């Protein structure tokens, strides 16, 4: 499906590719947004409106260019993201409503559209001039976590009994402050941030300064370099933090996925309804791993493609749930494939803020000495993973699911010749409903892992109360029951081996 495996590129999942795109000077096909036209032609204003989750096409003669005259809606009109044009029409989507000029305007001088002062998931505009733009955003949340009703210990697949630390505490869990924008040309974009996980204080990579740089050619292709999330599963495609829960994945998603790493990537669309990402990277997770610990083969790859057949979108930033209140059924099908040769030395710490250690389905880290028997130590393993996701949204309701497959093979190390290939698979499913539009959202999730070293599962239910009737501030409560979690670290609601109920309350700020 993807013909780009040999091109050293990758997907930009954390950086909003349409940020201040109306200043980019490029239309959907790469033409100037305010192209010079013949002074003899008369203005041809076109009004075009859309609602959240809807795409509207307005017939127009666009052969001589299109100019955004004025925005009339509440949602920002961002060129290439929420408005654009093709050979036969001007289109708007996701609440963008505006008036456009097509054809020539006598003696008109190209004007620079005013950048929006605020863009969701990009933040507030600090600087806007001919040299560049700077947006600032803040994401943070406070969490009360109660694990006191979990079992005190568990027995792994090899008969070892391990004690579980059961927490009850309050944390300002995470602090995330990115700066983003462009410099000298809107094609040259940056996304740089400081990230702190306070529950992991004292651990490696508890505070991270990172980011990426991107050159955007047009809506079909952007090339980036730096740190971003591998597009191994849907939740690492770039819609964070717009999940149903606050910064917590279900156990199957957490178990199978990759994490944040350094590399190069390619991102864009084959068609308005088909998006793609691809990345070549150092390893599955770079947080807390120095360059001296990484091998020199540059052999981690991850690819994804998403098809949105009905509406060409799946909500703002491709979010989970239908806060956007689609009036037409929105659908999505996504496919991901990843491969990496992982070394023992290049693994993040077990309490890393975005830990994605390779574990067996009982929670054991595969590189643990003597795990498979006395004198046996795995130093390297071949990791392959694939996932298929699908979902539908309509009038505040959503149903979304994903199935995962993982293959571990080619074990190398001390006395590893007798270790057979390991295959695991699993799924997650999530359903949600806006009980009170724009205010109260209810959701349910279930997840299961089928592994050679144990089958684990969880169920959870929760609510989101949007205090100001819009995204940005929400109070979240979530009750979960897990059976032998194979994943866990201080920034995650579960410890490894957890069995029993867990409850947490979160107050989230995101602008």
Predicted regions and their residues:
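Short Gly/aromatic-enriched secondary-structure transition segments
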Residues: 151-158, 265
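Outer membrane beta-barrel
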Residues: 123-149, 164-286, 293-313, 319-323, ...
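Extracellular, modular beta-sheet/disulfide-rich ectodomains of secreted and cell-surface proteins
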Residues: 39-105
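N-terminal periplasmic/intermembrane-space "pro-region" immediately following the signal or transit peptide
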Residues: 21-43, 103-141, 148-153, 273, ...
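Outer-membrane beta-barrel pore domains
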Residues: 112-115, 149, 164, 327-511
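Bacterial N-terminal signal peptides
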Residues: 5-18
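N-terminal secretory signal peptides that target proteins for export/translocation
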Residues: 1-2
């Amino acid at each position: 499906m993807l013909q780009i495996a040999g091109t050293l590129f990758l997907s930009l999942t954390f950086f909003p590719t349409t940020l201040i795109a109306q200043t980019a000077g490029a239309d959907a096909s790469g033409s100037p947004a305010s192209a010079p036209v013949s002074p003899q032609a008369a203005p041809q204003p076109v009004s075009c409106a859309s609602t959240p989750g809807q795409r509207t096409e307005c017939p127009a003669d666009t052969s001589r260019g299109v100019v955004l005259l004025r925005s009339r809606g509440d949602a920002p009109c961002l060129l290439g993201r929420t408005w654009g044009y093709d050979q036969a029409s001007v289109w708007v989507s996701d609440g963008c409503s505006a008036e456009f000029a097509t054809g020539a305007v006598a003696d008109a001088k190209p004007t620079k559209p005013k950048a929006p002062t605020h863009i969701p998931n990009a933040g507030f505009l600090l600087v806007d001039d001919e040299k560049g733009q700077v947006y600032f955003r803040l994401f943070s949340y406070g969490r009360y976590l109660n694990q006191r009703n979990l079992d005190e210990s568990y027995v792994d697949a090899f008969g070892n009994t391990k004690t579980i630390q059961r927490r009850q505490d309050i944390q300002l869990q995470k602090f995330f402050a990115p700066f983003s924008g462009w410099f000298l040309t809107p094609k040259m974009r940056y996304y740089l941030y400081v990230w702190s996980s306070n529950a992991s204080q004292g651990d490696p990579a508890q505070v991270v300064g990172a980011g990426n740089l991107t050159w955007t050619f047009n809506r079909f292709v952007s090339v980036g370099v730096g740190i971003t999330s591998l597009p191994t599963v849907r939740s690492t495609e770039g819609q964070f933090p717009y999940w149903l829960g606050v910064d917590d994945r279900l156990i199957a998603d957490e178990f199978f996925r990759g994490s944040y790493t350094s590399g190069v990537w390619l991102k864009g669309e084959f068609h308005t309804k088909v998006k793609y990402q691809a990345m070549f990277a150092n390893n599955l997770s770079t947080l807390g791993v120095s360059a001296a610990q990484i091998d020199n083969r540059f052999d981690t790859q991850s690819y994804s493609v998403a098809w949105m057949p009905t509406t060409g979108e799946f909500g703002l930033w491709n979010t989970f749930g239908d806060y956007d209140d689609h009036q037409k059924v929105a659908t999505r099908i996504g496919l991901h494939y990843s491969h990496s040769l992982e070394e023992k030395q290049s693994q993040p710490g077990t309490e890393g803020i975005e830990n994605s250690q390779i574990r067996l389905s009982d929670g054991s880290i595969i590189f643990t000495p003597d795990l498979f028997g006395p004198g046996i130590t795995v130093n390297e393993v071949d990791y392959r993973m694939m996932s298929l996701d699908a979902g539908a949204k309509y009038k505040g309701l959503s149903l979304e699911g994903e199935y995962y497959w993982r293959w571990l093979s080619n074990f190398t190390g001390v006395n590893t010749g007798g270790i057979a290939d390991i295959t695991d698979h699993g799924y997650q499913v999530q359903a949600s409903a806006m009980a009170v539009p724009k205010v109260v959202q209810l959701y349910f999730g279930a997840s299961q892992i089928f592994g050679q070293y144990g089958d684990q599962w969880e169920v959870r239910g929760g609510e989101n109360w949007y205090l100001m009737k819009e995204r940005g501030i929400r109070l979240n409560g979530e009750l979960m029951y897990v059976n032998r979690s194979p994943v866990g670290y201080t920034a995650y609601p579960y410890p490894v081996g957890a069995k029993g109920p867990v409850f947490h309350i979160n107050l989230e700020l995101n602008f």
